[in-house]
């Protein structure tokens, strides 16, 4: 059978989006891996699936697969594209929607200026909830990598993140340290790794090594986790502008227990069909 899909991106973090509300199919990890190949498939960082809700209090179910076939809990840039998709496809007439993910319920607000504001919910900072192996919650942790100690912050934005402060994102060892921290045994579900350069109290630069995808042009949950780490440690004040290789996100966070608000664009690139 042929499935309709839409190619989208949020700041260069690119997605294949499939509507399983009006279409019916059983998509498996092998399909994500096959379609995700940039040489022999469609090519994407993540596959986003729009499904009918299982929870009566939400509008849709939102599933995410990495290009390696792994299903993940959350994707912030994908959430903005999800919102743009369901409105453009007239799957809803609402401008504010709730969706359920493996990482919890998030709220999406499609603004008149075309920007999409996402309520990502409060960050999870308790190590067991990230999950991260540590005796107690702390602002930062020391992780041994190749015999060296690496200082990092850890948080979950529905998916696990480590954040390292660096002097320069250009010189940051993203491709050297990223995969080693991603697979570190103290992160039992692997981890996304952000390399954060604080420019001033309202502006930072960020590169992210994404779990199961490698370095991407942008990572929405990574930007949220980086902002939380920077605000908690007193480096920055909310709201903050996070500059990623693909563009800029605005992040607001009022402190522990409060939701992280992310605002940014979502762009439709093309429509297509793929054989299942």
From Swiss-Prot:
Substrate binds at residues 13, 46, 66, 76-77, 159, 192, 210-211, 220-221. It is an enzyme of class 5 (isomerase). One of its GO terms (biological process) is lysine biosynthetic process via diaminopimelate. SUPFAM superfamilies: Diaminopimelate epimerase-like. The record marks 161, 210 as: Could be important to modulate the pK values of the two catalytic cysteine residues. Its EC number is 5.1.1.7. It is found in: Cytoplasm. The keyword DNA-binding does not apply. Pathway: Amino-acid biosynthesis; L-lysine biosynthesis via DAP pathway; DL-2,6-diaminopimelate from LL-2,6-diaminopimelate: step 1/1. GO terms for cellular component: cytosol. Keywords: Amino-acid biosynthesis, Cytoplasm, Isomerase, Lysine biosynthesis. The active site is at 75 (proton donor), 219 (proton acceptor). The record marks 270 as: Important for dimerization. One of its GO terms (molecular function) is diaminopimelate epimerase activity. InterPro entries: DAP_epimerase_AS, DAP_epimerase_DapF. It catalyses: (2S,6S)-2,6-diaminopimelate = meso-2,6-diaminopimelate. Homodimer. Catalyzes the stereoinversion of LL-2,6-diaminopimelate (L,L-DAP) to meso-diaminopimelate (meso-DAP), a precursor of L-lysine and an essential component of the bacterial peptidoglycan. Belongs to the diaminopimelate epimerase family. HAMAP family: DAP_epimerase. This is Diaminopimelate epimerase.
